[in-house]
């Protein structure tokens, strides 16, 4: 799926509202995913996945930081996420089915906190962007 010029604009503009809040929004999205979809917890058996935990904040910051990097390199997301794609496929072996689940929860959190900015066209653009990111992250799976 290709992002149109309008999609790229919508994503960049929306991401400006996320800057400075990556850690909190990422932690909330992860908490929602782990709570509503317990099977996604399997990759973190010894971690504290409770709401507000330092692990959720740390990992949420990493997740949203990677997405911020993808936004900053929106014209070449493949290159921007190449190393992360390798890591998820070869080292972590994360089930590719989990990426859309996390994307959904990121959109939910964005809808809660950015409702004035997440209009229907923007929502569609961000959804497409997260789908592209998920595709890139699973492109190295065999």
UniProtKB/Swiss-Prot annotation:
Red blood cells. Involved in oxygen transport from the lung to the various peripheral tissues. It comes from the Eukaryota. Transmembrane segments: none annotated. GO terms for cellular component: blood microparticle; haptoglobin-hemoglobin complex; hemoglobin complex. Heterotetramer of two alpha chains and two beta chains. GO terms for molecular function: haptoglobin binding; heme binding; metal ion binding; organic acid binding; oxygen binding; oxygen carrier activity; peroxidase activity. GO terms for biological process: hydrogen peroxide catabolic process. Keywords: Heme, Iron, Metal-binding, Oxygen transport, Transport. Belongs to the globin family. Heme b binds at residue 88. O2 binds at residue 59. This is Hemoglobin subunit alpha. Residues 2-142 form the Globin domain.
